[in-house]
């Protein structure tokens, strides 16, 4: 038994084996989270943002059809911000997919775990930040996921 070990590890080989198993487990968890995030962003969030942007653009066009003197500043600002968020999400989706593929291609479990931690998690955070910002702008009826306020209210 190694000194200080609470898991009754008998020797260095067993310790390294357990380490590799833990690194593999970590990598698999982050991989699943990243793939889930990619699917949600591609199939739910970006389409919702685009649908809401279309609605806002149609509203602006309708207002301008009535009179060129009607302001569409609010709609323009909303479209600019959502477009920026959608672009950031799209870029993060591409970067995240590349980072996941690169991490999965590494030869050892410890290298994969480090790559998932150092390269995948930061891109997941960036994608999340853009999606969180878009959520605050999109109309409630368009957003496909429960909002933070609804989740807190119903807890």
PLM features: what roles do these ranges have?
Residues 65-105:
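Extended, well-ordered alpha-helical scaffold/bundle regions in very large, multi-domain proteins
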Residues 101-116, 139-154:
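Long amphipathic alpha-helical coiled-coil segments
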Residues 40, 44-51, 55, 81-95, ...:
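Charged, amphipathic alpha-helical oligomerization/scaffolding segments
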Residues 62-75, 80, 121, 141-155:
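C-terminal structured domains
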Residues 33, 40, 70-77, 84, ...:
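A structural signal for alpha-helical segments
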Residues 2-8:
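Short, small-residue-biased leader/transition segments that mark boundaries at the very start
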Residues 12-79:
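C-terminal catalytic subdomain
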Residues 56, 63, 93, 100, ...:
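Leucine-rich amphipathic alpha-helices with coiled-coil/heptad-repeat character
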């Amino acid at each position: 038994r190694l000194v200080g070990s609470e898991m009754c590890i008998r020797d260095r080989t067993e310790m390294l084996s357990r380490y590799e198993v833990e690194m593999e487990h970590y990598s698999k968890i982050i991989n699943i989270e990243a793939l889930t995030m990619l699917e949600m962003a591609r199939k739910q969030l970006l389409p919702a943002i685009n649908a809401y942007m279309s609605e806002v653009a149609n509203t602006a066009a309708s207002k301008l059809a009535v009179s060129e003197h009607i302001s569409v500043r609010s709609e323009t600002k909303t479209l600019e911000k959502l477009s920026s968020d959608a672009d950031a999400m799209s870029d993060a989706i591409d970067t995240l997919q590349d980072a996941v593929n690169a991490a999965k291609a590494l030869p050892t479990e410890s290298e994969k775990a480090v790559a998932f931690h150092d390269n995948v998690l930061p891109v997941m955070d960036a994608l999340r930040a853009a999606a969180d910002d878009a959520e605050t702008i999109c109309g409630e009826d368009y957003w496909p996921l429960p909002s933070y306020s609804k989740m807190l209210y119903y807890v």
